[in-house]
Design a protein with these regions (language model features):
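Non-heme di-metal
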Residues: 1-199
Length: 199
């Protein structure tokens, strides 16, 4: 189904190690609003989506989120690849180092491991797309928080800014998907029934 291109969606060339920033950015890998959950959410929801164009959108955005996942992992790797023990000690990355050294593993900034309970595939077109819109806004908020933490390093700031912009685009696309779904339902009551389970 997929063709892998050996390049990132946005170039990442981080020159300076920063274990503290890596410990924060990793949340967009395996945190509650991260790219791993987003990709799995959309690629799971597409199967029961009754509207072909919306199922296609879920596939497209879910696939793009896999690319964002690769970007976040690359950032964490580049921020930690040449660390010394002196740079690690006393930083938020120190606890992560104990379990993973400098391997890239999905967890939130607070150390909570990724869990599939953080995303849903409800089997209801309206419910799922409403969740997707909320998920994109939560991810945008997380990127806003990360951007405030790294203004002094353009090598980190610019890729994060790109990822934040994509969250806004995805939110808009899911808004369009909601309009498509609603246009196919009873306009007097959009919530009268589940269009994925008409029984």
């Amino acid at each position: 189904m997929w063709n892998y291109e050996k390049r990132l969606q946005y170039p990442i060339n981080i020159k300076n190690c920063n274990p503290t920033l890596a410990a924060m950015i990793i949340s967009q890998y395996g945190g509650p609003d991260g790219e791993l959950g987003a990709s799995m959410r959309y690629l799971s929801q597409r199967y029961s989506m009754p509207y072909r164009e919306v199922a296609g959108l879920l596939t497209d955005i879910g696939t793009e989120e896999l690319g964002h996942l690769e970007m976040v992992r690359t950032m964490v790797h580049q921020l930690t690849r040449n660390l010394t023990m002196e740079q690690i000690k006393g930083t938020p990355f120190e606890a992560y180092y104990v379990d993973h050294t400098v391997g890239v593993w999905p967890q939130a900034a607070g150390g909570v491991p990724f869990c599939a309970i953080e995303f849903q595939s409800k089997g209801d077109a309206i419910t799922d797309i409403a969740e997707d819109m909320a998920a994109e806004q939560k991810a945008r908020s997380t990127y806003d928080n990360l951007l405030r933490l790294c203004r002094d390093d353009p090598d980190v700031y610019e890729p994060l800014k790109f990822l934040r912009e994509r969250e806004v685009v995805h939110f808009q696309r899911f808004g369009e998907a909601m309009s498509i779904i609603q246009s196919k339902l009873d306009s007097k009551n959009f919530y009268a029934y589940n269009p994925e389970f008409k029984k």
